[in-house]
């Protein structure tokens, strides 16, 4: 007998064949009309939120963050140069879209720290992520030995320093020592060490 969390996970793995697909399509319509960062009462994917550390208690909130899809382009340079040196179109950013979503959620709630985030959907224009935020000064968080580490000053602004899971991936880390020797402790610091 599958647990309820397993059933939720399986339905998200095969979304187009599952029963929640019509509901998800309706969600996309309403999500596009809503704001870019919206606080939620409960997570859309309960299994994923719980596996990433979410608890339904005081000090924890869930925020849905919306980020545009695709590459970026910078404003066109009006000074003279060869066309091939313009480089204002088809730019790939070093940050992942998920990390950008986490940073925008952290900007909206400056008194909270980002714990983690997970994917909840996309349409033709946007990708949607739900971000787990923790109030670092909440008594319920400080008394919980599993999450009280986030109240340390070393973890302040962790999303901006690439210390979340999405940040680790963007920095070329997160898959052990093998293959990331030149990315540690960071790409910039490693380059300085090799001079």
From Swiss-Prot:
Listed name of the protein: Large ribosomal subunit protein eL15
Database matches in SMART domains: Ribosomal_L15e
Protein keywords: Ribonucleoprotein, Ribosomal protein
GO molecular function term, any single one: structural constituent of ribosome
Family to which the UniProt record says this protein belongs: Belongs to the eukaryotic ribosomal protein eL15 family.
Lineage: Archaea, Methanobacteriati, Thermoplasmatota, Thermoplasmata, Thermoplasmatales
GO biological process: cytoplasmic translation
InterPro entries linked to this entry: Rbsml_eL15_core_dom_sf, Ribosomal_eL15, Ribosomal_eL15_arc, Ribosomal_eL15_CS, Ribosomal_uL23/eL15/eS24_sf
Region: Disordered, residue numbers: 174-195
Pfam families according to UniProt: Ribosomal_L15e
PANTHER family, alphabetized: LARGE RIBOSOMAL SUBUNIT PROTEIN EL15, RIBOSOMAL PROTEIN L15
GO cellular component: cytosolic large ribosomal subunit
